[in-house]
């Protein structure tokens, strides 16, 4: 399988997001990289499902709460940015204060 660098990045985000999703499902609190991966993967999947940038910006704030992450992690993540592919091209999706 031949993947370009962008496709490799998306594959890495998806894999890390899947690990984070499984850990969250087991009741574990997510650390910083897991929380960012969880949100990023969900945003990429949302774009694939046809959500708009505005919808994704709101959706990103609903995925995790402070009770889902280790102490201090919510304060460490001021924003999450991911370049998602939409029918009309790639766009940068930014979610400010994703963990409330």
UniProtKB/Swiss-Prot annotation:
It comes from Acinetobacter baylyi (strain ATCC 33305 / BD413 / ADP1). This is Urease subunit gamma. Heterotrimer of UreA (gamma), UreB (beta) and UreC (alpha) subunits. Three heterotrimers associate to form the active enzyme. Its main location: cytoplasm. It is found in: Cytoplasm. PANTHER family: UREASE. GO terms for molecular function: nickel cation binding; urease activity. It catalyses: urea + 2 H2O + H(+) = hydrogencarbonate + 2 NH4(+). GO terms for cellular component: cytoplasm. Keywords: Cytoplasm, Hydrolase. The lineage of its organism: Bacteria, Pseudomonadati, Pseudomonadota, Gammaproteobacteria, Moraxellales. The keyword Cytoplasm applies. GO terms for biological process: urea catabolic process. Belongs to the urease gamma subunit family. Pfam families: Urease_gamma.
């Amino acid at each position: 399988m031949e993947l370009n660098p962008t496709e490799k990045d998306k594959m890495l985000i998806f894999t890390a997001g899947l690990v984070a999703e499984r850990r969250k499902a087991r009741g574990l609190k997510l650390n910083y990289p897991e929380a960012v991966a969880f949100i990023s993967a969900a945003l990429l999947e949302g774009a694939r499902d046809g959500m708009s940038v505005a919808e994704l910006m709101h959706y990103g704030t609903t995925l995790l709460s402070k009770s889902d992450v280790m102490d201090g992690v919510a304060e460490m993540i001021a924003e999450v940015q991911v370049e998602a592919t939409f029918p009309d091209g790639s766009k940068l999706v930014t979610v400010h204060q994703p963990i409330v």
